[in-house]
Amino acid sequence: MKQGAVICGLAIVGVLAASPASADMSKAFGNTIVSHYPNGQWVRHYFDPDGRYTSQFSDGRRVAARWSAEGDKICLSGFSPRQILPRFCSRMVEADVGDTWRARDPLGRNIRNELVAGRR
């Protein structure tokens, strides 16, 4: 299995893992996960080693939360501002910078996630 970072399929995100029991988020730290919507909108997701998560939406909105690895999932909770769902978990996906994968956002909409080098 190639070394990956944890990228959650939420928009609010998507994540990569060396193994489900031990999420290796290192490739997500310092990089950006971009969720692309079919209508051209996007969400940029940022994970920090200390459990902080932030996102920026194409319409200017920003969201903050805490992330945690739980088995084969990455979960977000403690959203600020509050969201429709108080907690959202997404399966882990193995990926490297430049990789893309399909997922669904918390409302069930199709998205294409991409792990992009650097913070954008």
For the regions a language model picked out, list residue spans one by one.
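Lipid interaction determinants
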Residues: 9, 18-120
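Bacterial N-terminal signal peptides that target proteins for export
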Residues: 1-8
